[in-house]
Regions:
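Charged, amphipathic alpha-helical linker segments immediately N-terminal to NTP-binding catalytic cores
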Residues: 86-89, 95-131
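Hydrophobic positions on the alpha1 helix immediately C-terminal to the Walker A/P-loop
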Residues: 166
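P-loop NTPase nucleotide-binding/switch module
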Residues: 130-150
Length: 172
């Protein structure tokens, strides 16, 4: 995972009211550090070059329809490949019913499997927007903003050195 800010998977599950289809012990404490989400359409065909395992994976109607045309053995092979990468979570959109091979593979690899009733594109854009805010770098500064002759001036300094008192004295 990256070195920047992180967010617990449990927070995302609660925020988006995701249904937990399978969650190994401690799954709520998994840390998410990547602001992007992947739709593993190419991976469902067997292409895993340049696959970013640190992203959450979102399966929608397109991926599900493709898998429906595959045999149970092919589905098992694809899900085994996907879950073997140990991504933070796999989310099924549109309230789609998981294939038995999907559940079996999630348990086999102790992978988190979630579901939302939301439309795939809407959920993806909302989740990415949320992750962008939650995982944005932040910085804390001690300071007070004062107006001097109509211009804003930021007085910065260590905590407790009298910035606010200086501001109050300038008002008097």
């Amino acid at each position: 995972m990256g070195k920047g800010p992180t967010i617990r998977l449990g927070t995302i599950i609660d925020q988006f009211h995701l249904e937990v289809l399978y969650g190994p012990e401690g799954y709520r404490d998994r840390q998410i550090s990547i602001q992007d989400v992947n739709r593993p359409g190419l991976q469902m065909t067997g292409y895993f070059d340049y696959f970013d395992r640190e992203r959450m994976q979102l399966l929608g109607l397109v991926e599900w329809s493709y898998l429906q045309e595959r045999t149970a053995e092919e589905r098992m092979e694809r899900f085994d490949q996907l879950f073997s990468y140990h991504t933070p979570a796999v989310i099924i959109a549109r309230g789609l019913e998981p294939y038995p091979e999907c559940m079996e593979s999630a348990k086999k690899y102790d992978q988190v499997l979630l579901r939302t009733k939301e439309n795939t594109a809407d959920f993806m854009s909302t989740l990415i927007a949320y992750l962008r805010v939650a995982l944005s770098p932040t910085i804390t500064r001690h300071g007070v903003l004062v107006e001097v002759y109509g211009e804003g001036v930021l007085l910065m300094g260590e905590s407790g050195v009298g910035k606010s008192e200086t501001d109050r004295k300038s008002v008097v």
